[in-house]
Swiss-Prot record:
InterPro entries per record: ATP_synth_F1_dsu/esu, ATP_synth_F1_dsu/esu_N, ATP_synth_F1_esu_C, ATPsynth_dsu/esu_N
One annotated Gene Ontology cellular component of this protein: plasma membrane
Family of this protein: Belongs to the ATPase epsilon chain family.
Protein name in UniProt: ATP synthase epsilon chain
Main location: membrane
């Protein structure tokens, strides 16, 4: 059994991460999960949420936007729409996006076609702020 997981995280635009890590956690459609070396093969969808991984004792955090997570042997492949490292997130921009989404949702009913779009925008902004705050605490 390998002691590390080889993680490849890609968006439609670029490879965001290619590292050997000790462990990784993410937010799946059914909740948060973690993977260690030697994990059984696994495939799940990801929702808007946080991905965290530990490498050489240092925890790193990223904000993800929808995708898929696959474990095969000691390789983890993560395919997502967007991914931002904690230190890349503009906290002021995330706060502004949160405010815009909250204001839009106040004016809409759940039956409105735009409601889910703004609901997802609100969730993305909240996750980005949560992840950025973790980078600020370092």
């Amino acid at each position: 059994m390998a002691e590390k997981l080889k993680v490849e995280l890609v968006t439609p635009y670029k490879r965001v991460l290619s590292e050997e890590v000790d462990e990784i956690t993410a937010t799946g459609a059914l909740g948060e999960f973690g993977v260690l070396p030697g994990h059984a093969p696994f495939l799940t969808s990801l929702k808007i949420g946080e991905l965290a991984y530990k490498k050489d004792g240092v925890q790193q955090h990223m904000a993800l936007n929808w995708g898929y997570f696959e474990v095969e042997g000691d390789k983890v492949t993560v395919l997502v729409e967007t991914a931002e490292r904690a230190d890349e997130i503009d906290l002021e921009r995330a706060k502004a996006a949160l405010g815009r989404a909250e204001e839009a949702l106040k004016k809409l009913s759940p039956e409105d076609k735009s409601f889910r779009i703004y609901e997802a925008a609100l969730e993305r902004a909240a996750i980005r702020m949560q992840v950025a705050a973790k980078a600020a605490r370092k």
